[in-house]
Amino acid sequence: TPLYSSAASDVYKRQAKAGVLALAKGLSRTYAREGLLVNAVSPAFIHTPMTDAMMNKRSKELGVSFDEAIESFLDQERPYMELKRRGEPEEVAAVIAFLCSDKASFVNGSNYRVDSGSVATF
């Protein structure tokens, strides 16, 4: 569930995610002068064994194919995910690899959303 979900039932999960982001921001400020950079990565609906299990369950509950279960989930639960697919673990890993590289030596205290543009901001 994304941090920005409107589902009231997800309040505790959203609260925990907000806490993780606040922790990352606080640690980034605390340890930057020691050369430690802290950032967060917030993936959305990623192709994992957990989401496979979720979609298998949804498929059985709805009496539809696995792919149709994903499509209905995206339409109903994640209408703001513009790419209309699950992200791949490699796409999240690429962001993490960048953050671990020398190319990110001036990146600190940021949250990288790997989420298909789920949250539109300026």
Feature annotation, model-predicted:
Residues N56-Y80:
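A short C-terminal helix-loop "cap" of Rossmann-like NAD(P)-dependent dehydrogenase/epimerase domains
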Residues I96-A97, N108-F122:
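Short C-terminal tail/terminal secondary-structure segment
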Residues A16, A24:
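Active-site helix of classical SDR
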Residues L37-H47, C100, R113-D115:
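Conserved SDR Rossmann-fold cofactor-binding beta-strand/turn motif
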Residues F66-E68, Y80-V92, K103:
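A conserved structural motif in NAD(P)-dependent oxidoreductases
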Residues A32, L37, V107-G109:
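Short, small/polar-rich loop/turn modules that mediate ligand/substrate recognition or access, typified
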Residues T1-Y12:
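Single conserved hydrophobic/aromatic residue that forms the stacking wall/gate
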Residues P43-A53, K57, E61-L62:
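Short, flexible catalytic-loop segment of classical short-chain dehydrogenase/reductase
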